[in-house]
A protein has these predicted regions:
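Basic, polyanion-binding surface patches
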Residues: 1-116
Length: 116
C-alpha cells in the first residue's frame, strides 16, 4: 500500500481518477469511496475547514469505522495486525509501527511507471 499511497500523493485528482486504482465500496454516507484492501477505513463527514498559509486543513466527524474481525484482538483493534503507516516530514519517509516502510515522493514515482 505504500507505493500506491505515495503515488496518490504525487498526482493531482484533477488529472487522475485515483478511485480507479482501487476496489472500492461505499459506506453509510454513500458519498466517498472507501478502499477494500485497506485493513481500516474511517468514514467521515466534513465538519470544519481551516485555511493555513500554504494549505487547507479539513477536519471531519467520524461517522463509521470499517475493520475486519481478523484485525481484532480480544474485540479491540490490534495495531500490529492492522500495520498502519504514516508520513513524517521533513524527512519524507513512511513508517509502520516501529519501522520505516517507504520513502515519500520516490515509491509513488516507481508505481507511476507501472501505470499504462
Amino acid at each position: 500500500m505504500v507505493a500506491i499511497t505515495d503515488y496518490c500523493g504525487i498526482v493531482s485528482g484533477n488529472k487522475t481518477d485515483k478511485s480507479k486504482l482501487f476496489d472500492v465500496f461505499y459506506g453509510e454516507l454513500k458519498s466517498a469511496p472507501l478502499i477494500n484492501v485497506c485493513p481500516l477505513n474511517i468514514e467521515c463527514k466534513p465538519s470544519q475547514t481551516v485555511d493555513l498559509p500554504t494549505n487547507t486543513l479539513f477536519i471531519g466527524e467520524i461517522v463509521n469505522i470499517y475493520l475486519e474481525e481478523k484485525y481484532l484482538e480480544n474485540g479491540k483493534p490490534d495495531v500490529k495486525k492492522i500495520r498502519p503507516f504514516l508520513l513524517t516530514m521533513p524527512d519524507n519517509r513512511f513508517w509502520a509501527v516501529g519501522e520505516q516502510v517507504g520513502n515519500a515522493w520516490k515509491d509513488g514515482v516507481k508505481f507511476r511507471e507501472t501505470i499504462p
